[in-house]
Amino acid sequence: MKRHPGGEDHTLALLKRSGLTPPARILDMGAGAGEALALLRHQGFDAAGIDLEPRSPQVAQGNFLRAPYESASFDGILTQCAFYVSGDPFAAFQEARRLLKPGGKLMFSDVWEETQAVAIPGFVIETVEDMTPLWREYFLEAIWNGDCVPLPRGKKFRYLAITARKEN
């Protein structure tokens, strides 16, 4: 099963929309088994990954809400299906902002409450793609396989892919 809606093609599309080129330094926040990390490295990026429960020796073990990296040390942050399950997505955005260099790029795809405006404090939104239909298919497959995080009842969600630039 793909670890996020759209799989590798979606990761490559986010990268393209970001405008980042190798050898830019990119951190995968919530890297899991390291599939996107391996893809980034294969593309020529200087990439690192962090996850609470890494499933690859290439991924550092740690809490990305308090990542053990210097401020302003990355050109890009990639996160797919990770900020929502962190329990504090807004803290995750703040940490991403801390880690990015001025003008650095955030490549984000995750669930988003339908009632919330598409705005991320400290970032200028550059592109937004609503991937909700693809996410629904992915979510059904995850439920079938017993590999999903339940969503709160009474709220509506959509799945967005966003590229954003850190405000200076």
Where are these regions (language model features)?
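Conserved Class I S-adenosyl-L-methionine
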Residues: 126-168
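A short acidic, Gly/Pro-enriched loop at the edge of an enzyme's catalytic core
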Residues: 65-77
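Short alpha-helix
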Residues: 116-121
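A short SAM/SAH-binding and catalytic strip from SAM-dependent methyltransferases
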Residues: 76-88
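Conserved alpha-helix/loop element of class I SAM-dependent methyltransferases that forms part
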Residues: 4-22
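A short glycine-rich, Lys/Arg-flanked "PGG" loop and its adjoining helix->strand segment in the class I
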Residues: 90-105
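Class I SAM-dependent methyltransferase SAM/SAH-binding core
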Residues: 27-66
